[in-house]
Amino acid sequence: LWWGQHWYAITIGSALLTAFAVRVMWNVIPAMNASGTGEWDMTGGSDPWYMKRAIDYILAQNSHFVIDMDRAYPVGSINPRPPLFSWSLALGGVALDPFLEGDVHDAAWWSIAGMPAVFGALTVLPIAATCKRFFGMGAGAIGAWLMALMPGHVSHSTFALADHDAFVILFMSLGFYFWLCAVDSIGNDKLLEDSNWNPLHLVKGIRAAFKQHPAAMAQAILAGVSFATVALGWKGFVYGLAIVYAAFFLQTAINLVRRRDSMPVTAAIIVMMLTTFILPLPFYGNLQLNLIWDASGFQPLFYIVGFTIINGWIVTAFRDKPWLMVIIMGSGISTVLLGTLYILQVLELSNGWDVLTTGGFYFTKNKVFGTIAEAQAPSRGQLFANFGPLVFLFSLGMGLTSLWRGFKNRDPKNPSRLMGPASLVLAVWILLASYMAWSAGRFMFNATPVMAIMGSAAVVGLWRSSGVREFVKTWRRMGATSPRARFSSTIGAGRKHLGVPAIGMILILLFSQHAIYGIDSGIPRGEVGEKQVDETIYGLVPDVLRADLFGWSVMDGSPYTDYGVGEDNMTSCRGECWYMGTFGPGFNGAGWNQ
């Protein structure tokens, strides 16, 4: 009874603690003992070190690092990092300073190294909340553990990786959670009896939405605040809003054909977009930074907000007109707008066309991007391994299923099954995130939240469809009065319901593989912990399964080199571990540090 009341909180709490431990425990000592210097070190290349430079300036000058004279020397250039992430690390150092020896710069090292791991572990919570809200408590627990040990996420949120990735994904996940809640609860009932082409009619609809659906509109505002937080930490924030707009466009097209009112979802998305637009505007509008019309700054958001308002105005103003006429008119307006951008591009008056067609130049193909490793398409093995092969396939399958369900309303006979707008948002999110990850390695990390969400939904769906309820009934009917009876009942029920043991074996494979890859992602390459964990996993398998019987064994019986300092042992993997050594952060060598 007690476990039945508290199992979910215990499961989520243990996932949170495990996520933090995996990201921290093997990285603290190497981070504090840099090779060649014995001082602090960081992983992730040069980006974290520039972040450290910005934080040092904040601590020394008590102001944001705007102009860096060492960039584009001797002219100087702007600090390309938005302020919120670097300031959160700097203020973390200030908060820790009274409790640690040394000055604030020494205390800041703990904040710089530790906060990314904190942000990474906290991402478990919005993922669990999303899974629980839309797929049930079981999915929430599974989603939390999938995210806690997701290889692609662990490898970008470890201790001493002082980059904005973990911060961005935490608040991006929060933004999508609130937006999914908003579109799921706001519905498509008519807010206004009439439709009108006057743009002020949209304002009237937004007022009606606040009056009739205050909770949904509050969630839309919270989504906007979350996305704005991302904007103040990373200039590539627009990709999340582009996914939201793509789902909105598809939803309004469905509403047109089915004669439903799009005013509720239009009101919610306009409020959300404007919140995201207004909050970071003072930073991007700083005249020294000149980021308002920068292709990697605020310019893409102008297009997203503009298309959202125009799209919403068309589908609400002409709600009661024939849908074919509205689609033709909307296509005409879009053609004029896009054609204008293209002409301005040809006349070299604007680069808006390139910004739209290359995703703010993130998908551009030129010689410069050819020199950037993370801008290249990953190998298929790397892509599958970053999410877990089975998790990736399950998530894609669930995405296609959700796309189909997105065209339907919630079934009154099965209200727990997610359908409608929220299902459509999840489907568009997983499909676009998969395409982005397929196109460039830098986007694999961004796809991890939705992989965990849809992967957990797929696991729960498979388990329910395996016939587990009938299995339990058969098991009880066969008798469960003693350990022997329970064992024989399990065997008998498994024979009658073969789907349960089959799906059970698949899930064992999924979770064991996911856990091994996740732990491997948290261990720095070349560290002794890599070999120690590898030997521990090797020792979990009974020797009888590796025994060679008539030239055949259940598992690989090849000789294994144990951990140790002797001639026949190894202290690190050196590419010869059985389970570890595929992932993991890398600290700098003595040559770099000195």
Predicted segments with their positions:
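Start-transfer (signal-anchor) and selected internal transmembrane alpha helices
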Residues: 1-36, 46, 141, 217, ...
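Active-site lumenal/periplasmic loops and adjacent helix-entry segments of GT-C-fold
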Residues: 24-134, 138-146, 150-171, 191, ...
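Membrane-interface helix-loop-helix junctions at transmembrane boundaries of multi-pass membrane enzymes
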Residues: 204-214, 257-264, 320-330, 393-427
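Signature aromatic-anchored transmembrane alpha helix within multi-pass, membrane-resident enzymes
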Residues: 332-335, 462-522
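Hydrophobic alpha-helical membrane-interfacial segments at the cytosolic entry of transmembrane helices
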Residues: 218-227, 242, 248-249, 258-284, ...
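Alpha-helical transmembrane segments at the extracellular/periplasmic loop-to-helix junctions
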Residues: 296-316, 328-408, 422-423
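Transmembrane alpha-helices and membrane-interface helical segments
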Residues: 125-129, 174-182, 244-255, 273, ...
